[in-house]
Amino acid sequence: MKRIIQPEILDRLPPDDPRAIRSRRDLRRINGLMGNHHLMAGALQKCFHDHPVKQIVEIGAGDGSFLLRVAQKIAPHWPNVNAMLIDLQKNISKETLAAFASLSWHTEAFVADVFGWPQIESDVVVANLFLHHFDDLRLAELLRMISRRTKLFIVIEPCRAHWPLFCSRLLWAIGCNGVTCHDAVISVRAGFCGHELSALWPEKQGWQLTERRAGAFSHLFIAQKTS
């Protein structure tokens, strides 16, 4: 299935648009159905099995709910984490930041383009349902930038395959709104399969790359520095 990138409605809506609010709520449900927070928590714990992470950056963080669910799973073993949530829109509520604080995670939200976020290094950078928005040229640029700022990059994206595409057309049946139903199909068509992200990673030497299908609907990519 050829990768096709098209604009998504949610990206063009103001954060306070009722359709955007409803669609973000839908996305929280979809992430739960896909099990993406379980996948991310498991990958983090496997990669940092001998010590907890201290600094984590999420790019394309949306409303922050995804990383919050991940934090709720790992916070008992990983306290006092500094988390930076980066998104192009101001979507993260005070309630979400307070929920992070209740887990002893210090969290900051930055409104910034992913290509212009603060020049800092982090133990790990994560992304969930975000990279599929970019074509290969921009992806290569983004991956090159990330490889210089972290020793671990974990990504979960839509799996570009017939079964996820079929299921994406049925989201109306679980009450998702028109924005979500439209964007879900586009997201799967722009998703990844095989080793497409590995092929775009700028440094092969000194990195361990893992890329595979994860569950029924997701695609997992991990780049971990070995030297």
Predicted segment positions?
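C-terminal alpha-helical "lid/dimerization" subdomain adjacent to the S-adenosyl-L-methionine
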Residues: 158-204, 211
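Conserved beta-strand signature within the Rossmann-like core of class I S-adenosyl-L-methionine
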Residues: 150-159
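Core SAM-dependent methyltransferase catalytic element
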Residues: 209-227
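Class I SAM-dependent methyltransferase SAM/SAH-binding core
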Residues: 57, 63-116
